Amino acid sequence: MIKEYRTIKEVVGPLMAVEKVSGVKYEELIEVRMQNGEIRRGQVLEVQEDKAMVQIFEGTSGINLKNSSVRFLGHPLQLGVSEDMIGRVFDGLGRPKDNGPEILPEKYLDINGEVINPIARDYPDEFIQTGISAIDHLNTLVRGQKLPVFSGSGLPHKELAAQIARQATVLDSSDDFAVVFAAIGITFEEAEFFMEDFRQTGAIDRSVMFMNLANDPAIERIATPRMALTAAEYLAYEKGMHVLVIMTDMTNYAEALREISAARREVPGRRGYPGYLYTNLATLFERAGRIRGLKGSVTQIPILTMPEDDKTHPIPDLTGYITEGQIILTRELYKSGIQPPIDVLPSLSRLKDKGTGAGKTREDHAATMNQLFAAYAQGKQAKELAVVLGESALSDIDKIYAKFAERFENEYVNQGFYTNRTITETLDLGWELLAMLPRTELKRIKDDLLDKYLPEGK
């Protein structure tokens, strides 16, 4: 039953306190009817006895305490879902933003989703090809995984996000694949970049986009990733599609949480973020996965900018605890002109060994991955030594490793944002680079694989 009250007690920032209420639930949707007839929407953030704290999506400016009324709608924020969402652009609250018609929903779903029973989860073990060598070969993404990208302010993470959205696919052509893209608190220029890129490259045809701009209300920023994940779960578990969810920028999401927490006068945690930041992020990231008996899957790539490039900042720190690895972009590689500037050594995909090998990628995947890691690490060490002691201090084998590291960065990692490599092309390129080294140095690869794949004459 919808209830209406005229008992607004206080307005503070985006928050409004309503008293003498009954039967109100956490996260229930509300409508505020103002004295001029305007209607604004909001959400219940807290309930104590007969008092409710609500946040207004459009802000509280102009609300008159005596002449405004509040209606509690009896349900949480919902998203109307349908397969017709594919190819469309929505705002952070799921309203069409592309001048297209309203979606005719098949059903309405609570954006908070439902917890996946751990027993019902299926283990992620199928390869997703992004077309980016540093990810596909060395930090493999598998269906159902959550693999974040840790970037820094000014680094090209938006170009990387667009590239993954364009290029990502599953190798089995019979499987339906879709991308759900959530832009959180981005600038107007960034929004234009994403929409233009998706339209020009045709990526929009298999994508659902949710765009929340920096000047939109903070509460909408909280809702945007939940809208995206609700759409993804519908496409995955009810329509049998493999869905990749890209969310950028999760730092803006955490800042919105901090803003709301401060308005509620909560006791702050580390660096002013609320003490529940970890559990709140987990409610998003744990919605990735596969369910036994269902065909579809939800894979997540959340992208965040590390304030001051600090990996120990609460946002990347807590994200790392919840997710299954990280892809790290570095300023050093970016300044060297490497695009995308992925530093493969500190990057990690904890599930990479589950989605590789014969029948998934190729039999030589794991061995060449380990050898490339070892050779690049040794090459970087040799280059650092040459800076300190001079190149003449290097042994002959160290000079080879230093050249290997240089070629690895310039040819393997530096593929640009519009080159789409298949996993076969990436593996072959890895062998071409490993052929620089004496065969005796390739100790992490079995002889039968060396005989089969190492280029002639090595």
From Swiss-Prot:
InterPro entries: ATP-synt_VA_C, ATPase_a/bsu_AS, ATPase_F1/V1/A1_a/bsu_N, ATPase_F1/V1/A1_a/bsu_nucl-bd, P-loop_NTPase, V-ATPase_su_B/beta. Keywords: Ion transport, Sodium, Sodium transport, Transport. SUPFAM superfamilies: C-terminal domain of alpha and beta subunits of F1 ATP synthase, P-loop containing nucleoside triphosphate hydrolases. One of its GO terms (molecular function) is proton-transporting ATP synthase activity, rotational mechanism. It comes from the Bacteria. GO terms for biological process: proton motive force-driven plasma membrane ATP synthesis; sodium ion transport. Pfam families: ATP-synt_ab, ATP-synt_ab_N, ATP-synt_VA_C. Induction: By increasing intracellular Na(+) concentration. This is V-type sodium ATPase subunit B. It comes from Enterococcus hirae (strain ATCC 9790 / DSM 20160 / JCM 8729 / LMG 6399 / NBRC 3181 / NCIMB 6459 / NCDO 1258 / NCTC 12367 / WDCM 00089 / R). The lineage of its organism: Bacteria, Bacillati, Bacillota, Bacilli, Lactobacillales. The gene is ntpB.
